[in-house]
Amino acid sequence: MDKIFVDEAVNELQTIQDMLRWSVSRFSAANIWYGHGTDNPWDEAVQLVLPSLYLPLDIPEDMRTARLTSSEKHRIVERVIRRVNERIPVAYLTNKAWFCGHEFYVDERVLVPRSPIGELINNKFAGLISKQPQHILDMCTGSGCIAIACAYAFPEAEVDAVDISPDALAVAEQNIEEHGLIHNVIPIRSDLFRDLPKVQYDLIVTNPPYVDAEDMSDLPNEYRHEPELGLASGTDGLKLTRRILGNAADYLADDGVLICEVGNSMVHLMEQYPDVPFTWLEFDNGGDGVFMLTKEQLLAAREHFAIYKD
C-alpha cells in the first residue's frame, strides 16, 4: 500500500464502521491466512479495529457511527498495512487474544490461543472426568490461557502452569496477575515432567508442540511469527507427545485423566500405536486431534512409551 493509498484512507474514512469496512476489503483483496482465532475477514477486522481503539468487541451497533480522530485512523491503517504486508497475526499487533471468553495478553513469545480444548473447558470436561478436579496440570502452558480458563471453570482447584520457555512463562505470569489468579495458578518452569515433584493431578491438560516437519515447511507466513519452540515437534510431530505419554501416569491420581491435543499428527499417532485405546474427542465448534486417556489406560500402554520415560 503506497502513501497515496494510506492518505486517502485516513482522509476519507471517518467512522468506526468505515474502518471496519475498509479493513475487510483490504483483507479480502490480500488473501491473507486466517487461523489465529478467526476464519473470515469480518471477524479479523473486528479484532483489529476495536482493540486498536481500546474498545470491547461487543460495542453497541449505533456506536459504530462514532467519528475517529486522525491519530486513531493512522493507528488502524498502520496495523492493517502490517497485517497485509508482513502477514503478522492480529493478536500480535494488538497484544490481545480471547480464549474461553477471557481476554489475554499475547506477543511473539507465545502462540496465539486457539485450541479446541477451550470447548471442553467451557463444558467443564463433562463426561470426561468423574469429579471436580482439585489439582490440575496445564503442560506447555504458553500464554497461560488454558490454565487460567481452567481456574475460572474450577475455582476451588489449584492449577500448575508448566512450560520450558522462560519467555512464555513471563507472558503467562503477566496474564495470571492481570486475571487476579496468583493464588490459583502457579507458573512452573520445567522440561515437561522432568523438573516436577511427583504430584498427583486429577486432570492433566496439554497442548504441546505437534507440527511435523512436512507441515512446518509449508506453514502460511502468519505462523512464521510464532515461536518455533511452540510448534515444531520432530519429523512426525510426536516428539514431545511420546514423552508425555511415557510419564503422565506417574502424575495422575487413580481416577485421573489426560487430555492431549496433537492436531494433524493424530494420523501418525494412530498409525504407530494402533493398540493404544485413544478416545478421540469431538467438538461442536470445530477442531479435532484431541484425545483422552485415563491413568489405567496409560499404565496398560506403558510398554509402548517406556523408552520415553524421564
Swiss-Prot record:
Gene3D superfamilies: DNA helicase RuvA subunit, C-terminal domain, Vaccinia Virus protein VP39. It catalyses: L-glutaminyl-[ribosomal protein uL3] + S-adenosyl-L-methionine = N(5)-methyl-L-glutaminyl-[ribosomal protein uL3] + S-adenosyl-L-homocysteine + H(+). One of its GO terms (biological process) is methylation. It comes from the Bacteria. Keywords: Methyltransferase, S-adenosyl-L-methionine, Transferase. It is an enzyme of class 2 (transferase). Its EC number is 2.1.1.298. CDD domains: AdoMet_MTases (cd02440). SUPFAM superfamilies: S-adenosyl-L-methionine-dependent methyltransferases. GO terms for molecular function: nucleic acid binding; protein-glutamine N-methyltransferase activity. GO terms for cellular component: cytosol. Specifically methylates large ribosomal subunit protein uL3 on 'Gln-150'. PANTHER family: 50S RIBOSOMAL PROTEIN L3 GLUTAMINE METHYLTRANSFERASE (PTHR47806), RIBOSOMAL PROTEIN UL3 GLUTAMINE METHYLTRANSFERASE (PTHR47806:SF1). Belongs to the protein N5-glutamine methyltransferase family. PrmB subfamily. This is Ribosomal protein uL3 glutamine methyltransferase. It comes from Shigella dysenteriae serotype 1 (strain Sd197). The gene is prmB.
